[in-house]
Amino acid sequence: IARVDECDMSEELKVRTKAEARFFRAFAYLTLTQYFGKVAIVTEELPYDAPTIARNSVEEVRNFILTELAEVAEILPESYSGGFMNEIGRVTRYAALALRSRAALYFGNYEEAEKSAKAVIDSGKYSLFKLTSLNAAQEQEAEEMDLYIDFAELGIDKDKFIKGMFSYEALWQGANATPANPEYVLTHEYMGDPNAYDQYRYTYFIPLSMSIQNGYSSFEPMQDLVDAYWKVDGKTLPEKIQVDARKANYEKIWNYAKNLSEE
């Protein structure tokens, strides 16, 4: 930040570059204060042999983060057109506001969290990523969901549930994991590995013999995580599943998969 003015670039670009750096500094301080609480706020370049700096209070660090993000949000552009130094995916005004909303939420400052989040929402630049149709493999999985969920009994729209589930899954896949995705506010792009494959989904999560991949069924959510989610009515916690009911569910799935392998 201190040496940007020495660079050969336009004044406009210098101002924006400083704002980008301040964004990441605030991001770093957010991580630090979440781990350690009180940390030293350093905004100037220090010599190697500088004396030890006293830590600032938690309140001071939090105010610094929220103030920095609010200020850089007024400097950063809403979007980028592409090209050198204007690459799509760089920090935008709404990335700063989104991070500010998250920080304020962590700090228990709900008024500021709502204010910053509403600014992002009202911009109209972002929306949930939604699939409009399913491929053959997804259709098969959707059919198997009836083994787990009685949609009619729970009053759940199966089509919306299934498309919502697969939309969330597809959100992270390579073809959709780009700055062009309407749900992405800030992205970190990297080179993909052509040898990578979806091992976790087909081995650790899927029950044994549920598919030709022979899952391990070793990654399962703890009950505390399950209970952290609301039921379809948005209010009450789900009832505990009894052992006999769990046993019956597993037998139903096992028999279904066994019949598939015999066919």
Enumerate the predicted regions with their spans.
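Alpha-helical scaffold segments in carbohydrate-active enzymes
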Residues: E20-L32, E71, A95, L99-Y106, ...
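Solvent-exposed loop/turn segments at secondary-structure junctions
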Residues: V39, P47-Y48, M191-D193
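Short coil/turn linking the two alpha-helices of tandem helical-hairpin repeats
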Residues: T33-Q34, K38-A40, Y80, A103-N109
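Aromatic-lined, polymer-binding surfaces characteristic
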Residues: V15, K38-V39, N86-Y94
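Conserved, well-structured interaction surfaces
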Residues: I1-F36, T52, N56-E60, L69-F84
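An aromatic- and glycine-enriched ligand-binding surface/loop that stacks and positions planar moieties
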Residues: R93-L97, A104-E263
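Glycine- and aromatic-rich loop/turn segments at beta-sheet edges
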Residues: K38-E45, A73-N86, S127-A137
